[in-house]
């Protein structure tokens, strides 16, 4: 078996309609041909994108990219787990409640949480403190905002509905989130 991962799939499989210069059409055509030819082999193709609206619909037909997963931002428990990993080894003051930070970071991505932890560390350094306090995190929360806004969340929901209507529902293995 072989797993082929295409990160930023939208740059390789851009919709012919949205590719004004048609530069990617040759790449897209070749990818589609190769994916058709490998249908019976042990090759799994994974495409990753944060711009699903740019991917050509032909990539979403049976035998190509059969399963579409929309990865939601981390929930509160996941944010807590991420924060614990990010702060492991950081000199945290005794007054820090990581649960409170997880609660107050709704719509933060893992990258947003990493920025928050770095910001809290910088705040502690600016105070010449050896420990990162809850106030350092509170200041960080004012500076580091979540990258997923209501508008972005709605946009992804709309795209999810659009993409879900393209993929044939006949395959029992196809699922959506």
Features from the language model and the residues they span:
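Walker A/P-loop NTP-binding motif of AAA+ ATPase domains
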Residues: 1-108, 120
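C-terminal engagement/docking regions of AAA+ P-loop ATPases
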Residues: 97-117, 125-177
């Amino acid at each position: 078996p072989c797993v082929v991962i295409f990160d930023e799939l939208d740059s390789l499989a851009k919709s012919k309609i949205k590719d004004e210069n048609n530069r990617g059409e040759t790449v897209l055509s070749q990818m589609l041909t190769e994916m058709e030819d490998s249908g019976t082999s042990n090759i799994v193709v994974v495409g990753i994108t944060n711009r699903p609206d740019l991917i050509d619909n032909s990539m979403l037909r049976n035998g190509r990219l059969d399963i579409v997963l929309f990865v939601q931002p981390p929930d509160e428990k996941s944010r807590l787990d991420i924060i614990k990993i990010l702060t492991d080894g950081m000199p945290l003051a005794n007054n820090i409640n990581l649960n409170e930070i997880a609660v107050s970071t709704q719509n933060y991505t893992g990258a947003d949480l990493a920025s928050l932890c770095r910001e809290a560390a910088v705040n502690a350094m600016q105070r010449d403190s050896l420990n990162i306090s809850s106030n350092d995190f509170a200041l960080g929360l004012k500076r580091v905002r979540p990258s997923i806004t209501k508008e972005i969340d709605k946009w992804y929901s709309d795209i999810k509905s659009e993409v879900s209507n393209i993929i044939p529902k006949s395959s029992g293995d196809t699922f959506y989130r």
